[in-house]
């Protein structure tokens, strides 16, 4: 019985590799921008699975670019330093003291943890913030009522080109400065990932989230919509099917597709090896939004 089980396991592995082959061939040399955050960042086993997925993508010739958040660790440090955390309209209100913590955590801690984790697997990862080389230029979000919360004013992809050409994996924190006064701003990592994907003419934008994807019924995890056209995604927002925290993620995908990204994916980062399951299998595991059929 044990030998039979082993043969079945071996056959499954071979089948998975066989299914992945055409995708590996198709995406070799292509750029995929991945927003990494949520549960996949908070839990050690999921974190390890993401690092292995990224290492494998790089190993087979895909050019991954990682953009990360770090909300839970920011909250922990704010609490430790007795700085109150405030959220408004789903965004962190960021005064000067909070921004110091955000920059310390995202640039100095989380970014280096990801870089070190990837490098341990033989991946050549390089840590950057949006401020480095003016990779991302920020502008104040809205009317400035949220303090040092920013939006993307401009992306300079030339900073990343030599790294990608030489096989490095850029790991980017979503902190960037305004060009007029050089003040650091906290930008939503989904937004940074989407704008980078467009500027890099990426094949895919992938958002790791804490939900299965876009749901037809937000209270039913089995109502996953596996594929949408750009026009259908817009309609779901208008109809209120996409609401709450899924709205900015879907809008991020829409903007990226409108600027030339081939496909955008919203996937469940709580599933081990979600990246490989989405990129290298026929069924995928999340929602894929495409510009056309």
UniProtKB/Swiss-Prot annotation:
UniProt keyword terms in alphabetical order: Amino-acid biosynthesis, Arginine biosynthesis, ATP-binding, Cytoplasm, Kinase, Nucleotide-binding, Transferase
Primary location class: cytoplasm
GO molecular function, one term: acetylglutamate kinase activity
Pfam families membership: AA_kinase
Record has Kinase as a keyword: yes
Site positions (Transition state stabilizer): 35, 249
One CC-aspect GO term: cytoplasm
Catalytic activity from the UniProt record: N-acetyl-L-glutamate + ATP = N-acetyl-L-glutamyl 5-phosphate + ADP
GO biological process, one term: L-arginine biosynthetic process
Pathway: Amino-acid biosynthesis; L-arginine biosynthesis; N(2)-acetyl-L-ornithine from L-glutamate: step 2/4
Signal peptide: none
Binding site for substrate: 70-71, 92, 186
Locations listed in the record: Cytoplasm
Enzyme class, broadest EC rank: transferase
Cytoplasm listed as a keyword: yes
Record-linked SUPFAM superfamilies: Carbamate kinase-like (SSF53633)
E.C. code: 2.7.2.8
HAMAP family xrefs: ArgB
Its biological purpose: Catalyzes the ATP-dependent phosphorylation of N-acetyl-L-glutamate.
NCBIfam families: argB
Family as reported in the entry's similarity comment: Belongs to the acetylglutamate kinase family. ArgB subfamily.
Protein name (Swiss-Prot/TrEMBL): Acetylglutamate kinase
Organism of this sequence: Synechococcus sp. (strain CC9605)
Gene, per the UniProt record: argB
